[in-house]
């Protein structure tokens, strides 16, 4: 039914007889001639019907867009004045000798020549995927997974499947629950990750494991999140954190080179503390040259409580972003930026425009100038490397609030002012995260997950001072996206019980939820570490789209619904009865 793909034809095929199968992309009737653009998954080629093959020409008059057809014909060179440099096949065309119509098409509910709403695209996803750009996204995804499998196989990793129906464990998000018909009143959980199973595989002696695996999280969705997503999941025994990072960095380096021909170079490493202080984010976008600078020590004794109060607080921060040549930012824009940081809890946004850096206070324009002395403003200029023509934005609040607000402002300024180098790739590793953080109720929670090992802490030291512990964890960040994260795991049962205890999981709950893990840790568990990459997010970056749904064949909406199949749907009453479940709505 096919000898070649449409999009694969080129000058080397001139003179060859070919059989093509695909769809009518466009049709043009020029009187005595009919041209169509014929499309398959590999691309588009122009097909010409001319009077030499009258039967095919007559049949072609009935063709319409999206008819599914077969063409038999000869590849010829296009005349020089008809070469289309915008098409991969633009130097050739196919003269059709025979035409078969596999199937006709109704008028499409989507218009491929216009921008359709995302709702329309998701409802008719099978048609949306016919678009060349969508087909290219899925081909890139397949290329990525093929490369990953090759790399992992070459480096001695075993592809081992782990269960989909498993036990609910606290991993930071709600589980999708599956009721058991056999064990009435009991539920399986769909895995948020294969975390515990891959650790158990290390205990079983499979020292290099990987899996490209579906995971599930019932959480509030964002543009780059889905309720079901795919991980490249990795675990190793007898490897240190730097060794794990090295082998995974080589994989990602090769992936970029193989997929888009980009050399990412050596990945720099930065601590979580440095990333937060300099960039206001634990996944900094290093394409943006703006940085956050602390000035609390300079302003702690000025007569301006907005600055001096957080500057003198152990939990406060006063920070500055210098925008080079930002003096022309208008008051209206400043007001908009003030509203913007308010989204992150900031109470305001102070600013200083520098007209003449050599004139001290006389050379600045600012509503806070009256609270500053010549010495203070000079110290701030020196700290921020300010120049005439710059503007300084100040954030002052609790440390986390000021950091989050200034980090978000940094990104917005970079986008708005064209400072972020969108044509660059800036990868890095972020390491040494806090072991614990406070949740909304003020309780300690694991920043990564409760199986992450602390750095250089005994169980006794961790119990005594948990908030000072640093996790032996690491995230890979590319252009402001966390593409992968992992850690060295706890392999000592006493340390694991200590972490559970700090998290408020008592001994009875430990046995109920994690008894199998605690038992396994007693039998000669090796030191082990791992990492997981988000395949969807990697593909999103490598295809250049900003919407993760563009790289998943059949994604869900932000409301976790499938518009095409109308899932989720009401369950059959008899099925619910067999499961001993009653719905209350």
UniProtKB/Swiss-Prot annotation:
Binding-site positions, ATP: 217-219, 226, 482, 534-537
Broad class of the protein's primary localization: cytoplasm
Region (Aspartate): 195-198
EC number of the protein: 6.1.1.12
Catalytic reactions of this protein: tRNA(Asp) + L-aspartate + ATP = L-aspartyl-tRNA(Asp) + AMP + diphosphate
Any one biological process term the GO annotation gives: aspartyl-tRNA aminoacylation
GO molecular function terms listed in the Swiss-Prot or TrEMBL record: aspartate-tRNA ligase activity; ATP binding; nucleic acid binding
Cystine pairs: none
Subunit structure: Homodimer.
Family: Belongs to the class-II aminoacyl-tRNA synthetase family. Type 1 subfamily.
Name listed for the protein in its UniProt record: Aspartate--tRNA ligase
Organism: Histophilus somni (strain 129Pt) (Haemophilus somnus)
Taxon lineage: Bacteria, Pseudomonadati, Pseudomonadota, Gammaproteobacteria, Pasteurellales
């Amino acid at each position: 039914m096919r000898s070649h793909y449409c999009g694969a034809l080129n000058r080397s095929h001139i003179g060859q007889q070919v059989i093509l199968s695909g769809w009518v992309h466009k049709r043009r009737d020029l009187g005595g001639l009919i041209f169509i653009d014929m499309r398959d998954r590999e691309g588009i080629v122009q097909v010409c019907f001319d009077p030499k093959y009258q039967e095919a020409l007559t049949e072609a008059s009935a063709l319409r867009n999206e008819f599914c057809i077969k063409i038999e014909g000869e590849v010829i060179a296009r005349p020089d004045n008809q070469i289309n440099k915008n098409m991969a096949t633009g130097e050739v065309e196919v003269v059709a000798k025979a035409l078969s119509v596999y199937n006709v098409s109704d008028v499409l509910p989507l218009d491929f020549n216009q921008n359709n709403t995302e709702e329309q695209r998701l409802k008719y996803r099978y048609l949306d995927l016919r678009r060349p750009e969508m087909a290219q996204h899925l081909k890139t995804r397949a290329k990525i997974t093929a490369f990953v499998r090759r790399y992992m196989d070459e480096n001695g990793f075993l592809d081992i499947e782990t269960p989909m129906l498993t036990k609910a464990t606290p991993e930071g998000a709600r589980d999708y629950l599956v009721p058991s018909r056999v064990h009435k009143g009991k539920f399986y959980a769909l895995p948020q990750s294969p975390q515990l199973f891959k650790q158990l595989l290390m205990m079983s002696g499979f020292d290099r494991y990987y899996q490209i695996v579906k995971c599930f999280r019932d959480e509030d969705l964002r543009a780059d999140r889905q309720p079901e997503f795919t991980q490249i999941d990795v675990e190793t025994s007898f490897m240190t954190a730097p060794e794990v990072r090295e082998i995974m960095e080589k994989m990602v380096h090769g992936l970029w080179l193989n997929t888009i021909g980009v050399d990412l170079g050596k990945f720099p490493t930065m601590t979580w503390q440095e990333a937060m202080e300099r960039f206001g984010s634990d996944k900094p976008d290093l394409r943006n040259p703006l940085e956050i600078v602390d000035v609390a020590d300079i302003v702690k004794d000025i007569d301006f409580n907005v600055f001096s109060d957080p500057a003198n607080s152990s939990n406060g921060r006063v920070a500055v972003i210098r925008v080079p040549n930002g003096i022309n930012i208008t008051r209206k824009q400043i007001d908009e930026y003030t509203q913007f940081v308010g989204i992150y809890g900031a109470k305001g946004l102070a600013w200083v425009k520098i007209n003449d850096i050599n004139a001290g206070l006389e050379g600045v324009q600012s509503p806070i100038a009256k609270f500053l002395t010549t010495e203070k403003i000079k110290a701030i200029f020196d700290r921020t490397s300010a120049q005439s023509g710059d503007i300084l934005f100040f954030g002052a609040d609790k440390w986390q609030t000021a950091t989050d607000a200034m980090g978000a402002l940094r990104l917005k300024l970079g986008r708005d002012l064209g400072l972020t180098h969108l044509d660059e790739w800036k990868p890095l590793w972020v390491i040494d995260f806090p072991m614990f953080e406070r949740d909304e109720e003020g309780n300690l929670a694991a920043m990564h997950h409760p199986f992450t090992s602390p750095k250089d802490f005994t169980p006794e030291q961790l119990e005594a001072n948990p908030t000072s512990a640093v996790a032996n964890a690491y995230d890979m960040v590319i252009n402001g996206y966390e593409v992968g994260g992992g850690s060295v795991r706890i392999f000592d049962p006493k340390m694991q019980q200590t972490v559970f205890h700090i998290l408020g999981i008592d001994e009875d709950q430990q046995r109920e939820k994690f008894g199998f893990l605690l038992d396994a840790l007693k039998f000669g568990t090796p030191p082990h570490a791992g990492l997981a990459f988000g395949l969807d997010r990697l593909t999103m970056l490598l295809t250049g789209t900003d919407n993760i749904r563009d790289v998943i064949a059949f994604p869900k909406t932000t409301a976790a619904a499938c518009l095409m199949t109308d899932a989720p749907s009401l369950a059959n009453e008899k099925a619910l009865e067999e499961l001993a479940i009653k719905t209350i709505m």
